[in-house]
Amino acid sequence: EDENQVVGIVELVEINYIHRNCEIQIIIKPEFSGKGYAKFAFEKAIIYAFDILNMHKIYLYVDADNKKAIHIYESQGFKTEGLLKEQFYTKGKYKDAYFMSLLKSEYIL
């Protein structure tokens, strides 16, 4: 039923071909949340980063309170490397973020 509709965006940014790492970002429209689109898109982007772009490491930043996103990232093998205090500003206050990453050698599809 959602065919041919834009449900969100996934992108690889800050691509560094020397150090072979990049940042991954994903946003799914709220009305499509919980339907598996985030996991599907995330898997495809990870495969592209590792197999086509030959990245060694993919990383991301996530709101420390976003348990749903953290669960998806952990299910894909991402591990928390650190907590960044008051990393971003939203809705009138600063929020903490986790820095998470996945190494190609640790990725299992």
Q: Where on the chain are the PLM-derived regions?
A:
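Terminal substrate-recognition subdomain of acyl/acetyltransferases
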Residues: 93-109
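Conserved GNAT acetyl-CoA-binding A-motif
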Residues: 51-61
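Short glycine/proline-centered loop/turn elements that form peptide/ligand docking sites
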Residues: 38, 42, 65-69, 86-91
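Acetyl-CoA-dependent GNAT
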Residues: 1-31, 103-107
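Conserved acetyl-CoA-binding loop-helix of GNAT-fold acetyltransferases
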Residues: 28, 34-48, 70-75
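Conserved catalytic-core motifs of GNAT/GCN5-like acyltransferases
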Residues: 59-62, 79-96
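Conserved active-site tyrosine of GNAT-family acetyltransferases
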Residues: 73, 78, 100
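Glycine-rich acetyl-CoA-binding "A-motif" of GNAT/NAT acetyltransferases
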Residues: 4-8, 68, 94
